[in-house]
Amino acid sequence: MAHHDSVLVISSSPDFPSICDLLPKATRQPSLRSGSNAAPVSNDAPAAFTSAANIWQSSRARHLEGAEISNIGPSQSATTAADLATVPAESPIKSGVEGPTLPLGGDKKKPRTAGARKKKGKTETIEPPLALDMAVADGPVAVAPPKKSGRKPRAKKDATLAQTTLPKGKVTKTAAREITKAQKKAETVSRHFTPHTSAPPELVAGPIDDSPSVFEPAMARRMDWTPPRESASVHCLADSSMEKEVSSSALSLQDHVFKNLQDTYGRTMEASGYIGAALPLTSMDVLGKRKLVEMVSCVGHRQEIPQASPTKPKVVKKKPRTITELATAAYRRPEEAERSTLSRQQDTHIPSGNLELPSEQLTAASKSASAKPKAAKKAPKPRATKKKQSPPEPILLSPTSAMRQVSNQDFVFGTASQLATEDDPVLLRALHEAMKVSNQADSDPFATPSPGNSNLAIRRRSGAGLWAAGARYGDGDLLDAEVLDLTRSSPLTLAQFAQNPPPPCPEAVLADKPPVESAYIEIEMSDDTLDLTISPPVGSPKTLPPCPPRPGGQAVRHKDSNLAVSGRPQTPPQEADFDPPPSNQEQHQLLLSQSNTPQQPQPAPPPPPSFELYTDARLAKEVASYGFKVVKKRTAMIALLNRCWESRNKTALGSTAAQAAMSTSAPNQAASPSRPRGRPRKDSLTATTEVVQAPSPAKKGRKKAGVVSGAGSEVPQPEKWPRGRPRKDSAASVSSITAPAATNPRRRSAAISDVDSDEPQVEKRSRGRPKKDATTSPATRATRAKAPPSPKRAKSPCTTQPAPTTPRRRKAPAKQIFEIPDSGSDDPFASSAPSSPDQHSDLFSSPPAVDLSVTEDTEASLIASPTTQDVSLFGYITRAVASAPPTKDPANPSWHEKMLMYDPIILEDLTAWLNAGRLDQVGFDGEVAPGDVKKWCESKSVCCLWRVNLRGKERKRF
């Protein structure tokens, strides 16, 4: 047999010892030296980096060399490096056979004798022969199981490669050169490769006589990592993993061992080939033929499932759960479509672990998977049905139906985080019902300290709800801060007054009192809807004297100002109360019949209010209502308000004669000196109310109409009086009588033009009910009858107008009443200042202030007085500024452009520009003061400043 021929021998001996047993202990290496002290580099030093394999092989070689020297002797220490590496601690028989290999390494024998080089001598080229090309054919390898326990795990990884590389052989190198190369690499031995102390005893070889008996325990030991079905295959797999290369001389001495191994090896070659073919399939699981076929079929069906996957757009519907979704989940019902989709997915889904299912179940699953594309084709049908369900749009409801539907709907208020809580829907509905009831329940109209002396206050108090209770002015105080009357007795509602009528009141109508709801509706009636429709039907008993005041000195306060002044309760509403008012002729007859009725003395003025209970903001408003500047000290404001209130009451008491001179009455009626604060407008309304409540007698000849005033004075009427009521000048005439003396002359001129423009229309309109109601016409007639002559009197031909023919009686719808709010001014009779036409539309004018007393009856008007006095003027200023044409010079923008650019506005310059004729262009006859312009700028949030600063110096920069 040639020297290079090799035979594969399967070894059933145990594995090599562990690496820790083979590697030597870490020896302390000398420290590195540099410079002239550095040791010279050996010629045999390797040029490449040292690897873990080189270190392991070199250390193992050192152990083998030491073992041979101690057991064999110097004559047998010339074995090759390959034999030393593959056959550790061989017997004397093996060492004798290997004698011919001495010439290969004889020249390298001396370097091994050196202690330092003998331990390091091993090259990095020994690892491939150990793993791939060398085969162990001698008996001692199989006889010593503990020697190879650490080697077999490494050889097992390269079992397949060892079979393919057998014919190539291996060219080994001498150990002398390997020792020189390993001298430098031994320094990098890791602590991990330190050998155990029990390694040297295991290197001793043992007898190899009973090699067949050794195979069996080795086979049992390897069954845990080999997957064969027969014991022979176990031998095959276990032995094939250990293939090594030995020389031909060793094979000739071990024929009987090789024969036994060859018989075993020949049987296992067939099994090994079969297993090698089945390796790709056994990588997943150990399966039989039938299971392999079923697995292939499952894979085929699984490929069809992605084709049917377009039916999974339901997964796209999964959206991230938001707080809104969580909040609305309690009100949403589960959709049936989602349930059906989930059930369909569960039925048709085939899990990946169903490889062991029977063929019947797999075929059924394949049928369901094959039927899935059909279901995908039918999937658009449900989408089509959903589209058909979506087009039905809600029917457009009428406003009434829409409001009813909204009132029945539950609204959830709050932020999304609040809505995410798990609240009971029933609790939410109950909460909404309670909120709805609280919003609908308006507060008691009598509970307000102000009876509504002006329509402005009435309209601002539309309904006391949850929002109105917290409404505030711009300066921070409540809109209805004076809801509770702390200085007077508690207010009395109409229902309570009907239940406990005062003894002097003989009105029997209150006995049949209506329910609280009807009285509530009557209370809520404002001046716009009341008019003269509260008159009883013709034929009712004559008007009874008014009831005396309540013990607190107050009359029953209604929302209507005329009822508040009259001082007696109003009868419940009846059907006749809502009929149109009587015609002009019938009204004159009622006025004539009312002129003979006596008047009761009016109650004494109420005591002054306690200003100490007012807040600072309210005190500031009261002071501003009297025309004073802001006072910082609270005590000073209270003292000032007390003096102002006393002066006004004295003026009201002293003006009784003037009021008597301005009103007309029957000859038998005497003036009432106890009337402290009667206003012509309010008194005329009171008289008109009393007259309308009187029965209307049969139509008689025309008589001179008379008007009963609140003062009850007697004044003769002119011979001729127009039957028609003026259209719009009645309110202006009242304001002309009661305007303060300090009124701006521009307003007087506007009122004069207003009277001139309206009087020709009065002459033409002589029949039927005029556009303006009759609440203020009696007062107008009275003021025109006995007012002192003025320039407007000369222009007004109403007193000399001949009486037209008797108008036909016809019913006209009730007109809205635009009352004149109260304001604090100086002298009510000094001069007249009728408001301009725009003031009627804006519900603002300059009414008299003589009757005003700082009580709860007039607090609302006083609070609004700082803003209501100049609202009309502000409207003119706004129109004048906004209607000015834009400038063409960018360097000189218009006033409106300056305001839009937030430029500071010089009040003196803007006032001069407005008075230069700009206000005349917008219909305002007069001039404005810089203070009014400043108020306008502040109301519009316009940046304004004075040209002269507080020190009296003129500003140079703006």
Curated annotation (Swiss-Prot):
Q: Does the keyword DNA repair apply?
A: yes
Q: Does the entry feature the keyword DNA repair, yes or no? A: yes
Q: Which residues form a coiled coil?
A: none
Compositionally biased region (Pro residues)? 600-610
Q: Spell out the subcellular localization from the entry.
A: Nucleus
Q: Where is the composition biased (Low complexity)?
A: 364-373, 655-666, 775-787, 821-838
Tell me one GO biological process term: DNA replication
Q: Name one GO molecular function term.
A: DNA binding
Instruction: List the CDD domains hit by this protein, alphabetically.
Output: SAP_SLX4 (cd22999)
GO CC terms: Slx1-Slx4 complex
Question: According to the UniProt record, where is the region Disordered?
Answer: 89-123, 183-209, 326-400, 531-589, 594-613, 655-849
Q: What InterPro entries does the record tag this protein with? A: AT_hook_DNA-bd_motif (IPR017956), Slx4_ascomycetes (IPR027784), Structure-sp_endonuc_su_Slx4 (IPR018574)
Family, according to the entry, reads as follows:
Belongs to the SLX4 family.
Q: Subunit info?
A: Forms a heterodimer with SLX1.
Q: What does this protein do?
A: Regulatory subunit of the SLX1-SLX4 structure-specific endonuclease that resolves DNA secondary structures generated during DNA repair and recombination. Has endonuclease activity towards branched DNA substrates, introducing single-strand cuts in duplex DNA close to junctions with ss-DNA.
Protein name as it appears in the record: Structure-specific endonuclease subunit SLX4
Q: What is the originating organism of this protein? A: Chaetomium globosum (strain ATCC 6205 / CBS 148.51 / DSM 1962 / NBRC 6347 / NRRL 1970)
The gene designation is SLX4
